[in-house]
């Protein structure tokens, strides 16, 4: 990591909950300029949060961590959707929501283990959705 700023991953949380809205609001904070921010998730989930808040953000979108170049900016969105575009229903637990949360969390943990990011910040998760996706509470971080 050549850049002196810390690399912080922000996870969108449960796509059916308040997480995407909270992340949308967080991305508007000037304090984030003190770090390199990598939002990890599915693009359509952040867009749903932006619709609720009325915010838009100047993020650089990438599909692989290796595509990130902090000389081009300090806020990136790492889209891990792999082309899927699920329409998550708000306030409704589902295995799909839980799977999305677990995919983002596992991706961020792998980046942390390989020293590519320094910290993970995550919006609220729904343990019921995570359990529907095949995880019990004991195995959740």
In which residue ranges do the predicted regions lie?
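Contiguous, glycine/small-aliphatic-enriched amphipathic segments in soluble metabolic enzymes
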Residues: 1-137
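Conserved small/polar residues in nucleotide/adenosyl-binding loops
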Residues: 140-141
